């Protein structure tokens, strides 16, 4: 993909991806990697196109701070910003702008509704080899904003860090950097496996990711997560799931549906139930699991070739370094997986 690094990595560039200070304190490794991914995405995709998409997503999410922020080096004229509500007909927007923004809107609102026509249009503009990076960029500007909104309300106030939002770049592709971020998220084990799995499956069902709905975390399976428990996720409020699990699912829903509507009725019990470290892990977990939206949008979320067992489940686990240990059908399959705390 063409590089826009000269425009996107200058020291004076405003870090529109800057996270709430508490996240940098509670999860320094993962947030440093997320900063790297965000820096790289602005150097990979045309920053002017990405800025218009970021602003449109900010409006969709009710993110007032995001709508007011600007990445100055994207150089999007304010006249064009003012025309964003009319992007489909305004002469200020190119065909690529229109198709890119329309794709982003569908990605945010209901990613499973992404049409082949939309993908074909973008493929025509960008080329097949650049489509995944574009979808990844939309995911990043969406979920960075969701993370900013939710963490700012959910986590305690902490002093700003002067170095936040800037990080030393590593020589890696956008996909490789995103993978490193996901591995770092997985390495945290403050949450118990049952909570983690219920949250993961809530994300999968909301985004309608076929492969993620089929998967089952091995440590959660060993901790008692079965078909009966997972059947309660869709109607968790009226179920007999434990209250901590319901609280975690309420946070998940706010995060992936209406981050601007996270209420005191959710925040208060969350802070009383979970430690700041656990809440930070929960927020980052949701961003990690939601990378599934990239696969759903591109139609690469199929289960072909996976070892599905008689319960329709594929077990999987992680190595201590956060990488996937493998996929298997047998619960007794020997594999090294990370250890987790239990509530």
Per-segment meaning from a language model:
Residues 1-343:
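Hydrophobic alpha-helical segments
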């Amino acid at each position: 993909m063409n590089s826009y690094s000269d425009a996107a990595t200058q020291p004076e560039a405003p870090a529109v991806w800057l996270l709430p200070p508490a996240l940098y304190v509670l999860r320094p490794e993962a947030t440093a990697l997320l900063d790297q991914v965000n820096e790289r995405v602005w150097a990979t995709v045309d920053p002017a196109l990405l800025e218009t998409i970021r602003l449109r997503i900010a409006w969709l999410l009710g993110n007032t701070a995001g709508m007011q922020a600007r990445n100055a080096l994207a150089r999007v004229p304010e006249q064009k910003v003012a025309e964003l509500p009319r992007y489909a007909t305004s002469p200020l927007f190119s065909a690529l702008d229109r198709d890119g923004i329309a794709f982003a809107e569908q990605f945010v609102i209901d990613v499973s509704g992404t049409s082949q026509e939309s993908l074909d249009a973008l493929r025509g503009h960008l080329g097949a080899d650049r489509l995944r990076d574009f979808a990844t960029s939309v995911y990043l500007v969406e979920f960075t904003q969701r993370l900013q909104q939710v963490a700012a309300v959910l986590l305690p106030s902490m002093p700003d860090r002067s170095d936040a939002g800037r990080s030393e770049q590593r020589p890696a592709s956008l996909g490789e950097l995103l993978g490193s971020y996901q591995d770092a998220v997985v390495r945290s084990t403050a949450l118990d496996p049952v909570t983690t799995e219920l949250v993961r499956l809530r994300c999968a069902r909301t985004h309608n990711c076929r492969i993620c709905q089929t998967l089952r975390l091995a440590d959660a399976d060993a901790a008692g997560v079965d078909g009966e428990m997972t059947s309660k996720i869709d109607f968790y409020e009226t179920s007999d799931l434990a209250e901590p699990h319901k609280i975690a699912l309420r946070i998940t829903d706010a995060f992936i549906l209406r981050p601007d509507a996270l209420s005191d009725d959710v925040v208060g019990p969350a802070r009383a139930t979970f430690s700041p470290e656990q809440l930070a892990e929960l927020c980052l977990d949701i961003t990690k699991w939601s990378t599934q939206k990239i696969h759903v949008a591109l139609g690469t979320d199929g289960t072909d070739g996976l070892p599905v067992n008689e319960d329709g489940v594929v077990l999987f686990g992680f190595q201590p370094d956060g990488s996937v240990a493998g996929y298997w059908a047998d619960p007794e399959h020997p594999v090294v997986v990370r250890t987790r705390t239990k509530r």
